[in-house]
């Protein structure tokens, strides 16, 4: 049977292909088997499908796609994980993601939580391994599993983060320490929004739009309550950013730097010719990255400062995956130290919280019992002197804390992260979905949501230069990068150009610049997370695909380069809009 016929028969039979640790297998539906009647021995004749269409089922390429589309679709390993004999390591890393961390004095398999933290586990922010869920009006409660929101507190004059909180501000602390933010005093409110088309398509169909607003009063901030003041403590703004899906990030890591550079050069050319009006000229000019403008990602703390093309987070704050959101987040979300990060994630200043916490009488009273659960006077005499204020300050600002996560656990986490597959596209050969695909391109969506990329040799880079130091580890002396699953020469379908753009939305993202979010797999968000909404865009304001599209041309304070595509969407018939939406949900 031809490959194109195989895909057609699988789709028409409503079959399920399960991708697991040990490989894959296909379960054809009873309907297909029953169609072979006793008096009719002829094989069913599947619909012929264009091979180029059939290939689009492999969103992550042949090495990075899973064909499970149930509630655990985002949790599957790539075929490479099994091929490289990494299945056990993958499962160990999976536990690091799913299971909660506990404080040192509570015992347990995963100790080291705190002294400050955002969540006790990664799964809190990534329900079903996907995008965070929008939260209802009311108190900002990060104890709710599924609340993937992170607060962004910044100076509106220059878009710089305030220095008296962490870049990802913590709402929890292990006693006797006090949380940097009192979440009970933070309020989330949703507001209805009416766009310049009165939320109405030309054919009369209407839609709804909403946006979030967060109130963070001064009295919710610990260091301000303790007496800290600077120019921003009375002049700051707050935005929400949601976590994104983590499946397939290893495949994005396998895209060569020069391919991403070529895409930026292409869009710079469009900017120079007047086809688009917004472009990050401070980062990229005349076909070159502007190192002086901070365009490259570098790590000069653990690494050697080598420059790398940025590719992760909305702000494109990270480069290669081995030193990006996942490997960094499991440290700063939990404050669990490891051999390459023997220090705490506090405020951006590094000493403001430590200064005020060390002077807090209640913290001082509980610190001696706390520190005995962490280390000993023999290992760290500077935490056990007669001056408790100095002890607390020394502990909070130390760069030589005990490693609470083993090297083997960290490696397992990294293998798991880079080993997550992308769910296959669904029903992509359906006539209506193919019509939606053509419309997606015709009206201009594909200009930013670039459909496909080709991975390179996938020489894994780690700006962190992590090498296993534990002599008892089976990986002793090996680098983290050398142990990772790899995805060379794959055609993948993420639907992103890996470039930042501006959408000019009400209560927009900090700076206004946001990387084009990959669309692959997002249609399964509600299935995998249990959310009542599709939770699209950076702050989950869009409850469905239509809302997400229309926000691309809200044009608050500027005109988005996506406006022409949105206008094209508006002018489609109701049936055509439905087909385009079905396509977006199918990929």
Give the positions of each predicted feature.
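Bacterial Sec-dependent N-terminal signal peptides
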Residues: 3-4, 26, 30-57
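Glycine-biased, low-complexity coil/linker segments
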Residues: 19-20
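N-terminal regions that are enriched for targeting/export leaders
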Residues: 48-77, 90, 94
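Extracytoplasmic redox metalloprotein regions
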Residues: 68-69, 75-89, 98-409
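Electrostatic cytochrome c docking/interface patches
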Residues: 72-113, 402, 409-441, 455-456, ...
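The canonical Cys-X-X-Cys-His
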Residues: 117-129, 246, 413, 436, ...
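An acidic, gly/pro-interrupted, aromatic-rich
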Residues: 230-255, 259, 263-266, 485-558
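Extracellular low-complexity, Gly/Ser/Thr-rich intrinsically disordered linkers
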Residues: 350-422, 432-438, 514-587
């Amino acid at each position: 049977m031809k490959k194109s016929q195989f895909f057609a028969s699988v789709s028409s039979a409503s079959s399920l292909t399960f991708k697991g640790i040990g490989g894959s297998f296909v379960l054809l539906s009873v309907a297909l088997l029953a169609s072979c009647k006793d008096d009719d021995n002829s094989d069913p004749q599947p619909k012929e499908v264009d091979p180029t269409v059939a290939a689009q089922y492999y969103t992550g390429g042949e090495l990075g796609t899973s064909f499970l589309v149930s509630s655990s679709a985002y949790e599957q390993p790539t075929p490479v994980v099994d091929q490289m004999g990494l299945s056990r390591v993958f499962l160990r890393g999976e536990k690091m993601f799913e299971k909660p961390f506990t404080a040192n004095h509570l015992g347990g398999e995963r100790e080291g939580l705190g002294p400050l933290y955002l969540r006790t586990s990664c799964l809190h922010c990534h329900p079903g391994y996907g995008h965070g869920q929008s939260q209802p009006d009311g108190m900002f409660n990060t104890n709710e599993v599924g609340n993937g929101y992170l607060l962004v507190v910044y100076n509106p004059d220059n878009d710089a983060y305030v220095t008296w909180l962490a870049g990802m501000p913590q709402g929890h602390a292990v006693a006797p320490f006090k949380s940097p933010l009192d979440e009970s005093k933070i309020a989330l409110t949703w507001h209805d929004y009416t766009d310049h088309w009165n939320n109405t398509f030309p054919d009369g169909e209407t839609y709804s739009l909403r946006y979030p607003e967060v109130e963070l009063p001064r009295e919710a901030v610990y260091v301000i309550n303790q007496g800290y003041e600077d120019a921003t403590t009375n002049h700051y703004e707050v935005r929400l950013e949601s976590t994104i899906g983590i499946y397939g990030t290893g495949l994005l890591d396998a895209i060569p730097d020069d391919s991403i550079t070529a895409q930026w050069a292409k869009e710079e050319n469009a900017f120079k010719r007047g086809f688009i009006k917004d472009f990050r000229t401070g980062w990229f000019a005349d076909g070159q990255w502007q190192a002086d403008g901070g365009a490259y990602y570098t790590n000069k703390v653990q690494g050697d400062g080598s420059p790398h093309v940025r590719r992760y987070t909305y702000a494109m704050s990270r480069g290669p995956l081995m030193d990006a959101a996942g490997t960094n987040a499991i440290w700063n979300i939990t404050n669990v130290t490891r051999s390459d990060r023997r220090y705490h994630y506090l405020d951006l200043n590094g000493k403001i919280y430590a200064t005020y916490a060390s002077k807090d009488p209640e913290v001082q009273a509980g610190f001696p019992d706390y520190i005995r659960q962490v280390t000993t006077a023999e290992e760290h005499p500077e935490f056990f002197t007669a001056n408790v204020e100095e002890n607390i300050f020394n502990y909070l600002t130390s760069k030589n804390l005990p490693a609470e996560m083993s090297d083997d656990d960290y490696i397992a986490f990294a293998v798991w992260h880079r080993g997550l597959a992308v769910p296959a596209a669904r029903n992509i050969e359906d006539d209506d979905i193919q019509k939606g695909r053509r419309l997606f391109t015709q009206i201009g969506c594909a200009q930013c949501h670039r459909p496909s990329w080709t991975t390179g040799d996938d020489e894994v880079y780690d700006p962190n230069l992590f090498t296993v130091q534990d002599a008892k580890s089976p990986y002793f002396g090996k680098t983290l990068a050398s142990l990772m699953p790899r995805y060379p020469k794959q055609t993948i379908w993420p639907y992103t150009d890996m470039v930042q753009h501006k959408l000019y939305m009400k209560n927009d993202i900090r700076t206004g610049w946001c990387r084009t979010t990959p669309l692959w797999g997002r249609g399964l968000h509600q299935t995998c997370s249990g959310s009542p909404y599709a939770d699209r865009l950076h702050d989950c304001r869009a409850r469905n695909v239509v809302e997400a599209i229309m926000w691309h041309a809200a044009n608050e304070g500027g005109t988005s380069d996506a406006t022409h595509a949105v206008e094209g969407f508006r002018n489609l018939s109701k049936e055509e809009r439905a087909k385009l939406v079905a396509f977006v949900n199918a990929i």
